[in-house]
Amino acid sequence: MSNAKELYDRWLAQPDLDDAIKAELVSVAGNDEAITDRFYRDLEFGTGGLRGVIGAGTNRMNLYTVRKATQGLADYLNATDLPKKVAIAHDSRHNGELFARETARVLAANGITAYMYPRLEPTPALSWAVRYLGCGAGVCVTASHNPAKYNGYKVYGADGCQITLEAAEKILAAIEKIDCFDGVRLVDYDKALADGSIVMIDDKCLNDFVQAVYDQRVGDGAGIDALKLVYTPLNGTGLECVNKLLQKLGVTHVTVVPEQEKPDGDFPTCPYPNPEIREAMQKGLELCDKVHPDLLLGTDPDCDRCGTAVPDGKGGYRLITGNEMGLILLDYICRTRLAQGTMPADPVAVTTIVSTDMATPVAKKYGVELRRTLTGFKFIGEQIGKLEAEGRADRYIFGFEESYGYLSGAHVRDKDAVNATLLVCEAAAWYAQQGKTLLDAIEALYKEFGYFRNALCSFAFEGESGMHTMQNLMKNLRANTPAEIAGYKVDSAVDYDTDGTGLPRANVLEYHLAGGHKLMVRPSGTEPKIKIYLSAVGESEAAADAVNAALAEAAAAMMKV
């Protein structure tokens, strides 16, 4: 507590402290727990950049922690041969524009040209801008699908991918040398705008991004203009780019969920604006009951994840999971490109270790090499980069992860919900031409390859004590490999935090169970949670789901919840 209290006192004593920060610090005076939580550590910087609760202190997202991180990024960039240009974007979250401007001010003060989108834009549009403008790095101010109290600071490399571990460690080393009050260079925003050290990204860049997505069309587009859609941007950034794309595709029957149409950092209709969660899609589902569309599409606040619902044949709508949509799109892309003669030689698809095992037989059917990476789309982007370095970026046909991230082209290096919108609409139209829905598509795949069913259990551990609990749980699991889980014998266990997996070391444990089932344990890289991924295979959906239900109970016991 003593160190936290010293930091608290130092912050409070700053002569020009931001009024909102000062008011918050004054409000917690004498509250040791509140002070400790704000100051017991620096907000962790890693390959995902920064992410945390907005507020006062070293363990919060605020203009001082953002400035400090940016000074570290600037010092890193100025020590390399990379272009001294950085692209910046932000989403609809609280303080998003403020943090983007502060980022630009620090970069400009360090001789680095800051290119800013003039309004909020999707994360994939930031990845695009980095490559399009020839930048040395990029920053996207976003906390993706986290609750409203969060914001974040994602850093991208010159390739448009989120930074590598090596780059993150170098930036962190630079950050750790900086005092957030005395060690940061700043310029006046308006002055920097006038002298050209801060530049607004023009509309051509964004329009060319939408065109690049449109150019990823796989089929001939037959029937796509007949599609009837309900769309929700979940009060985030997706509306502009998704609308532009749908217009290019000729999809004109679009109803936007009115309560979720405009950007709103409070996310008033859903506390957790994540299209993976039914609650976030509920307003869209209610609208579907009134207008009866062919598809419901929902994009998260920074428009890199896309959720979908389709008619269930019983008068309602069923949400398609991220794994299911990944399989539908993988199958659609493969069969269509083979039929049209556009499949490259030695095609490659990429997914992650926590995504469905069913992708393996689907890829094999079409002669596609399936590569698996660690969790995080940056690793999928890294695989595209490796193919590009070999002069064979064309080999990449599709990448997906179970958390609703998809990408079918090399135009960006992060998951892209605008690209996903294109693919889902194409696939839905193709099946509609045959009198089928995407639900029929996944059911046909289940019947062909078996019912691979997946589920996710998340266990939250808040605050300093929660972090220690998470560390101890992982330590105990490593020391005591279970003999069985939910009555299924553990045939083998893999610890990804060791050498020999063929992948970079990661804090992930994998248990292969009798019957072909699987359970994986992984602390989240962006939230104070441990995630447990369940995978079951059965002769029917009900049989596989029953196994996952038993595994979920066992997972809760493992977490002592």
What are these regions (language model features)?
Residues N3-T103, N110, A192-L193, I198-A226, ...:
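An N-terminal, well-structured beta->alpha segment
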Residues Y156-L186, N323-P347, T351-V362, A417:
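Glycine-rich phosphate-binding loop plus the immediately following alpha-helix
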Residues D16, A34-F39, L43, N151-A280, ...:
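Gly/Ser/Thr-enriched, mixed-charge loops and adjacent short helices
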Residues F39-N59, A143-S144, L229, P233-L245, ...:
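Conserved phosphate/anionic-ligand binding catalytic regions in large, soluble enzymes, centered on
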Residues A87-Y150, K248-T308:
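N-terminal small/polar loop signature for handling phosphorylated ligands or for N-terminal nucleophile
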Residues D289, P293-L295, G316-R318, T336-R522, ...:
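Phosphate-binding and adjacent anionic-ligand microenvironments
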Residues E97-E102, S127-R131, K149-V155, E176, ...:
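Short acidic, glycine/serine/threonine-rich loops at helix termini
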